[in-house]
Regions:
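Residues that form generic nucleotide/phosphate-binding pockets
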Residues: 3, 25, 117
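C-terminal reverse transcriptase regions that engage the nucleic-acid substrate
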Residues: 1-7
Length: 213
């Protein structure tokens, strides 16, 4: 959510004690590319459903967030704060509501490839090897090179996105037909994050939502 909302990421943990799982989450270039997207526009809350299973404190809901990305792409976040796994569905007419309500946006009439932004994050074994080599600069550099991880000090996120670097796009998992829907099973207390990419000609991007900040 911090990436979708273009918020700063503040890490209060001791980086010397970072776990492989934490490194795999924090250094995911496909997620960081959303945070550093050249448009710099936050996602907007689209849908909220409180008619879900609550936890012992009576809390629980699901949310759908959506927003524009560089190059005509679209971000979709399916957030599940319910006390169970939830199958979530959102239509293109809803995803592009802020570009035109009631399905009037031209985007709804087009097909979209769906990219999972979590699918290609660093394997835990690789992350642990890198952490273990933190005091061995030669081995550290060798492991980073073998991992072929995106390095923003060499190529900016803007240039990487312009070049359609696959490391920034996530893993293509499906496509949505015109006037179709995005469907995903979202685990309890987690989120699924997707980048939608137009399969045909690009359409002019605009937003009806206002940035209040």
């Amino acid at each position: 959510m911090w990436a979708a909302l273009k918020s700063p990421l503040l890490m209060g943990n001791d980086l010397r004690e970072l776990s492989a799982e934490s490194l795999s989450i924090l250094n995911n270039p496909a997620i960081i590319a959303v945070s550093q997207d050249p448009l710099g526009q936050s996602a907007n809350l689209l849908l909220r459903d409180t008619n879900v299973k609550k936890d012992k404190y009576g809390m629980g809901e699901t949310q759908v967030w959506t927003g524009r990305l560089y190059g005509g792409d679209q971000l979709v976040v399916l957030f599940n704060a319910a006390d169970e796994d939830v199958d979530m569905t959102v239509e293109l007419a809803e995803i592009f509501y802020y570009q035109g309500p009631e399905g009037s946006a031209p985007h709804v009439q087009q097909e979209w490839d769906v990219y999972d932004l979590w699918a290609n994050r660093m394997e835990l074994e690789t992350a642990q090897e890198i952490l273990d080599a933190s005091n061995n600069s030669d081995l550290f550099e060798k492991l980073l090179k073998q991992a072929n991880w995106f390095n923003s000090t060499e190529v900016s996120y803007k240039d990487g996105l312009k070049a359609e670097d696959p490391r920034l796009l996530g893993k293509k998992i499906s496509f949505i037909e015109a006037r179709g829907s995005l469907k995903a099973s979202v685990k309890r207390h987690s989120a699924e994050v997707f980048r939608l990419r137009n399969r045909g000609s690009k359409v002019k991007q605009y937003m009806l939502a206002k940035d209040e900040l």
